[in-house]
Amino acid sequence: MLPKRKIIEVFEELSPQDNGYWAVPNGVYEVEFALVAGGLNGEYSNIYNAGSGGNGGGVLTGTISVNPGVTYRVVVGDIGGDSIFGIYQAIAGKGGRGGHGVKGDGREPSPGNPGQDGSYVFNNKYPDRYPYPMGAGGGGGAYIRGWNMGFYSGGKGGNYGGGDGAGAEDTSDIVINGKKGGDATYYGGGGGGASKAVNSGATSGRGGSGYRGIIILHYFKNG
């Protein structure tokens, strides 16, 4: 009687350092994949505009039949980059939308707009392993005018890990520099937008950094 083979479940997580080619392991004939593209940076601001939050990276899930030893091209998107597995591609900026930053002079002061939530990899099939959505949008920066109207908050980043937009104090008769948006903190998240600057000579605010993507390969192999 032949001994039973042990079957091992694998969730293989790839980063940009793994870019190149991935070879199908021995005994593997089906692979379920989740691709998350990189999130976009939040926008800069100036004395006319608040920065919008960066859009999150797109999320793509699928299953393919494979054969051992066959190689597939792998590109894990860094910030603002697409993620690719073979012929499949998740697009940067196609995830949760970033919160809009109010544009143009002459608007009323307002808080930043929130970013949209991301999406669950594998359609939330494995919530114990991947409990949070990926590819959230960043929040927009606050829009102020220098009218002594108090503090305006930045938009909340989308769930999970979108960068928050920058808030700012609306104070009169001073130069107010734009403030930096918050950095994204989870796969595919967009950065937060910068708050609007006020008065001539004010410096622009910088948008927060997006977060890189990830590729996850799920398969069963012989132990």
What is each PLM-predicted segment?
Residues M1-E32, T63, I214-G223:
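Enriched but not universal
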Residues E32-G223:
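Low-complexity, glycine/proline-biased repetitive segments and flexible coils/loops
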